[in-house]
């Protein structure tokens, strides 16, 4: 039995890769390590019984490294992949592991915000500015010249941020954050990212119910 990973299918399109950034993080890790895998698309609105048996909470992604044991949680899965397939190393030094870690929660708060004066935009800008300063000092990636786990965690989240905020709020990352722009361009142009990203329309469809709630 080979490596298998269950990931979210697109909303309304069960045969198309969906918009889960945590699923994409696992796929990116496998792609960057050149690990062959079988991808199983899960319709999260109509979860099959076999999937609920291996993931009782119904969450994606879940990963099977070939031993029949299914593992949930992208943090745990990517660590298991790193240990099982150590080359090339994607280890991020502990002091850099949390770089950009607050961006996604700030993005979702701002995206759902109906009050322009609630501080959610400022909070997101503060986190993006912190990423800018880190990349300016240590870039082009979080750990310098080589891509690492922290980048593969952040890349799908920045993609969601870029697509969703422009669509729903007409908002873009400020142009003066030049290192952040160079960073997203470097990440989004990688073969691994192009292969594993959701189409923009599926990403927008995934966020629409949350934005309009």
From Swiss-Prot:
* Catalytic activity from the UniProt record: RX + glutathione = an S-substituted glutathione + a halide anion + H(+); L-dehydroascorbate + 2 glutathione = glutathione disulfide + L-ascorbate
Query: Which residues are involved in binding L-ascorbate?
Result: 8, 19, 210
Report residues binding glutathione. 8, 19, 47, 60, 74, 160, 207
Q: Where in the cell is it found?
A: Cytoplasm, Cytosol
What are the record keywords, sorted? Cytoplasm, Detoxification, Oxidoreductase, Stress response, Transferase
- Indicate the segments forming the GST C-terminal domain, all copies: 73-213
Use in biotech reads: Overexpression of DHAR1 improve ascorbate pool and redox homeostasis, and enhances grain yield and biomass in paddy field conditions.
Free-text function comment from the UniProt entry: Involved in ascorbate homeostasis. Maintains redox pools of ascorbate by recycling dihydroascorbate (DHA) to ascorbate. Involved in scavenging reactive oxygen species (ROS) under oxidative stresses. Possesses dehydroascorbate reductase (DHAR) activity in vitro. May function via a ping-pong reaction mechanism with an electron transfer at the active site. Possesses chaperone-like activity in vitro.
**Family, per entry:** Belongs to the GST superfamily. DHAR family.
How does this chain assemble? Monomer.
Q: What is this protein called?
A: Probable glutathione S-transferase DHAR1, cytosolic
Q: What organism, scientifically named, is this protein from?
A: Oryza sativa subsp. japonica
């Amino acid at each position: 039995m080979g490596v298998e990973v269950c990931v979210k299918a697109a909303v309304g399109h069960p045969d198309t890769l969906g918009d889960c950034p945590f699923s994409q993080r696992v796929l990116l890790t496998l792609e960057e390590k050149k690990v062959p895998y079988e991808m199983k698309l899960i319709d999260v609105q109509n979860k099959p019984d076999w999937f609920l048996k291996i993931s009782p909470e119904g969450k994606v992604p879940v990963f099977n490294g070939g031993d029949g044991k299914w593992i949930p949680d992208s943090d745990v899965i990517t660590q298991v992949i790193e240990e099982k397939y150590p080359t090339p190393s994607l280890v991020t030094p502990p002091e850099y592991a949390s770089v950009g870690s607050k961006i996604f929660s700030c993005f979702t708060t701002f995206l759902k915000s109906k009050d322009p004066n609630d501080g959610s935009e400022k909070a997101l800008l503060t986190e993006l500015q912190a990423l800018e300063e880190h990349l300016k000092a240590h870039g082009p990636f979080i750990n310098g010249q080589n891509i690492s786990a922290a980048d593969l965690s952040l890349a799908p989240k920045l993609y969601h941020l870029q697509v969703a905020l422009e669509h729903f709020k007409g908002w873009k990352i400020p142009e003066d954050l030049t290192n952040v722009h160079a960073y997203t361009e470097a990440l989004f142009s990688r073969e691994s990212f192009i292969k594993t990203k959701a189409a923009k329309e599926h990403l927008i469809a995934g966020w629409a119910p949350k934005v309009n709630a």
